[in-house]
Amino acid sequence: MEDGKKMKILYEDNHIIVVIKECNIPVQEDISKDKDMLTIIKEYIKEKYNKPGNVYLGLVHRLDRPVGGVMVFARTSKAASRLSEQIRDKKIEKRYIALTHNHTKKHEILIDKLSKDEKTNTSYVSDSGKESILEYMKSSCEGAYSSP
């Protein structure tokens, strides 16, 4: 499968599939119509298990298009419900690792209100937006790079 090169499967069973999403691939279809993770994984499941018709795949969390990382998809509606509940109850924690060209402070918390421009599919700071909290801690510093 040609698009299978866009993902690496870390874990798979009858209930979930855990993959690495590469940078610059949308999680779901957007205005660009570029191939997205949901479609890629559905095609993979359909081909691997010789499934006729539509394949169920539950999207329980997202990563922004520019971001790469580990994603968990539900293969059943029951798994989707349970994963969504765990996320809602904060039993699942998201962690991001970033590499920056600039040195960062040792520890900082940034709080902003973000709104989304649907036409450009971008977010911006706005008084009427949804609260967004970013907390980071610098873990190392190597030459010109810093890893918060």
Predicted regions and their residues:
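RNA pseudouridine synthases
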Residues: 1-148
